[in-house]
Amino acid sequence: MDVTRLLLATLLVFLCFFTVYSHLPPEEKLRDDRSLRSNSSVNLLDFPSVSIVALNKKSKQISRKEAEKKRSSKKEASMKKVAQPRTPLSAPCVATRYSCKPPAPACCDPCASCQCRFFRSACSCRVLRLNC
């Protein structure tokens, strides 16, 4: 009984090893230098050369200034987006969290939208954007 269990355990270990080894991509399989040299399909001359350029202090300062300008312009753009005028409210409208099935009028809150679920059987006005 112990011999059969030992054989089954050995077989299981070999199957696990074979499964893992067979699923490795070709790049990860172990190879020696001879096979890499002879079977290499990728030629190192095909890749473009890399040139390293040292930056001087002026170029670093210019890039910092440009980065600061971009940051300030992004902040100004975000401030402009916040100050959008709100649309005037229409008289017949649906309050937030109430039913707004398609024959009903639009939601009262300009930041809210009508959200339907269960094949448009349950619809309600919900605020989806917090910073509207």
Curated annotation (Swiss-Prot):
Cellular location(s): Secreted
Annotated segments matching region Disordered: 62-88
Compositionally biased spans, kind Basic and acidic residues: 63-79
Pfam families xrefs: Agouti
Entries under InterPro entries matching the protein: Agouti, Agouti_dom, Agouti_dom_sf
Glycosylated residues (UniProt): 39
Stored SMART domains: Agouti
Residues in Agouti domain copies: 93-132
Cellular component, GO, one term: extracellular space
Disulfide topology: 93-108, 100-114, 107-125, 111-132, 116-123
One biological process term in Gene Ontology: melanosome organization
A molecular function (GO) term: neuropeptide hormone activity
Secreted keyword on record: yes
Signal peptide coordinates: 1-22
UniProt keyword annotations, A-Z: Disulfide bond, Glycoprotein, Knottin, Secreted, Signal
Main location: secreted
Domain of life (superkingdom): Eukaryota
Cell division among keywords: no
Role noted for this protein: Involved in the regulation of melanogenesis. The binding of ASP to MC1R precludes alpha-MSH initiated signaling and thus blocks production of cAMP, leading to a down-regulation of eumelanogenesis (brown/black pigment) and thus increasing synthesis of pheomelanin (yellow/red pigment).
UniProt free text on domains: The presence of a 'disulfide through disulfide knot' structurally defines this protein as a knottin.
Name of the molecule in the record: Agouti-signaling protein
